[in-house]
């Protein structure tokens, strides 16, 4: 699982820099509607919806807006025919890239995704070409300052698979993706504040990127995330602190 924190940092950097709030809200609402349609409107029993609600709240979306999106998903309507589509390919430096999209038009989506790979020196692959390099996991992030021993005990008691301290003092906790909600609840009940919790694709191996290749991968991520239909971008690129300082 090495390298995921670098991916998370890249993702958080992008989210912090992205001033297009309207586009962010559109993507969040799509996910809320789709999650509710697929798994029902009860966030307590629908891990995907729970994660979507948490993301929406973290982005300062109002409860009313969230509830309306959930109601649309449960009740059906013109905007509930979205399908999850995952595209796989290779980015700069031979990095493996997975692009998770929500779309009602596959042709439109592929016309957005493919040029991003091409312009950044990568190429779109076939289904399964890089997916085997990732595991679907639940990811919980705890900010710096938590007591490691107490957090580890709480995480294990809640059913977590693994806990990894990060260089910045934060902690990443991994779970079976189906058990993300239960583990999260257990950790919260133990008194710890959750910074982020989501279902993610965790790379099993990573590719070290030098100062020349790293910016190319970051550009690819930015271009993909700017596509309207793209919800999440996962990759196995590893950017060291030394290289990051040069960017």
Swiss-Prot record:
Transcription regulation recorded as keyword: yes
GO molecular function: DNA binding
Localization per record: Cytoplasm
Transcription among keywords: yes
Classification via InterPro entries: Integrase-like_N, TACO1_YebC-like_2nd/3rd_dom, TACO1_YebC_N, Transcrip_reg_TACO1-like, Transcrip_reg_TACO1-like_dom3, YebC-like
Pfam families: TACO1_YebC_N, Transcrip_reg
GO BP terms in the entry: regulation of DNA-templated transcription
Main localization (coarse): cytoplasm
Cellular component aspect of the GO annotation: cytosol
Annotated keywords: Cytoplasm, DNA-binding, Transcription, Transcription regulation
Similarity annotation: Belongs to the TACO1 family.
Protein name: Probable transcriptional regulatory protein Asuc_1803
Species of provenance: Actinobacillus succinogenes (strain ATCC 55618 / DSM 22257 / CCUG 43843 / 130Z)
